[in-house]
C-alpha cells in the first residue's frame, strides 16, 4: 500500500515502463493530419484504413513506441480524451481486485503504438482517464 498526502492509501501498484499514446479530440481529423504530418513531419498510421471505414481513427507516429490518435469530437468536449502508459506484464484481475484504481473499462484488447494488446482504463484522483497497457514480448 502506498500512502498519499491526503491520508488515503492506494492498493497494489503497477510498474510503468513507458508512454504509449495520447488521444486528442479534434474537430477536423483531415486538418489535424495535415498539421501533424505536414509542418511537424510525423508519420501517418492507419490513415488509409480510417478513410476506408476499417479503423475508428487515424494516428501519427511520434517515435517507434509512441503515437497520437486523432479522434473527431465536437469542440465543446475536452481536447484530451486519455493517455496511455505501458506497464510491466501483470494479472489484470489482481489489479482490479486490489481496489487501488477506479476502473472505468476493461480489461480488453485495443490498438496502441505497437499494435494490439490488453489494457485497462482507470481514473486518476482528478477524473482524468489513464489507459494502462502491456504488450506481449513479440510486440
Q: Can you say where each PLM-predicted feature lies in the sequence?
A:
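Vicinal oxygen chelate
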Residues: 29, 83-129, 137
